[in-house]
Amino acid sequence: MILLVDADSLIFASCYKKRENPEDDKYYRNIEDAQAKFDEQFMSIVNKLEDMYPVERVITFSGSKGNFRKLITSDYKANRKKQELPPLLNEMHQYVKDQYDSVWGYGIETDDMVARYWYELSNELGRDNVMIVSID
């Protein structure tokens, strides 16, 4: 089994810490804390899947930039509210690119990149041998 992991949402979530009190900071400010949270969650997912399937390879995807759909229509994702981004988000994307050798591209969203790899690999190896892992 080949796992194709869309890590963007996991990266985003790893920037947030559990707050004990409402006034506590919601973000990690120390990159090592965010990295540890990502690593723990990522490996938990992979380990659970390895318990169920014979995983041969894990390909991680994250941090793609731009989107061809925005060139086609300016309304693409226009209904989304502007949201404050976690301060360590860019550093975390770079960490995952470096540490997990993640696949990314320009002009395409990460989930589209995952779908393209799934299509190519499932045609080559069979649909039962390739799994997309994503929370979005």
Question: Predicted regions span which residues?
Answer:
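Conserved RecA-like ASCE P-loop NTPase motor core of nucleic-acid helicases/translocases
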Residues: 130-136
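Noncatalytic, basic helical substrate-engagement surface that gates or grips nucleic-acid strands
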Residues: 2-128
